[in-house]
Amino acid sequence: MKNLFLLVSLLFLLSCGKQELDWLILSPNNVNGLTNLKFLLSGFTTTIFISIVSISLSIVLGLIVAIPSLAKNKFLTYLNIGYVEIVRAIPLLVLILWIYYGLPIMTGISFSPFVSGIIALSISESAFQAEIFRAGINSIRKPQWEAGSSLGLNFFRKLRLVILPQAIRNILPAIGNQFVYVLKMSSLVSIIGIGDLTRKAN
């Protein structure tokens, strides 16, 4: 029964899509193929650049958002929770379209498609990065904070010199996963005319 199911699934998959795909259009052995390949690679470099810039900005913004959640002030804690929950609830495509089309109408401030895409990706990802940083910082045991206090360090110096170096080792895998997520979701910026890999492939 299992083999029959696999056979039916294989036949179904083989029937999907176009059978006349010509992969020789990307062959570097002919002039047209080489041109097409360079065209696709230019989109690939754009995708990688957008992803790296977006993840870098989101890490900085995420850390800024995460720090107030460590405070005992309830207002700051609720502000942090509100930002994270609202931003994570907004679909990325909606955010991209709103920043590129909606923001100029409402405020008169407009950005190029490239900048709009990076802003949208950075804001959307910053909410996830904030939670990653918060979890990483909270994973450091209380004696480490007390050790920083015994050295006469203030809150931010304790965070920078004692806590964050240890927390970063714990959260690196999660940040790596989020980079892969941003790399995949960056394909949505093609909707506002950015020549990334998705748009060039189409």
Q: What kind of region is each of these model predictions?
A:
Residues 8-11:
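Bacterial N-terminal signal peptides
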Residues 2-4, 14-202:
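Transmembrane alpha-helices and adjacent helix-loop boundaries
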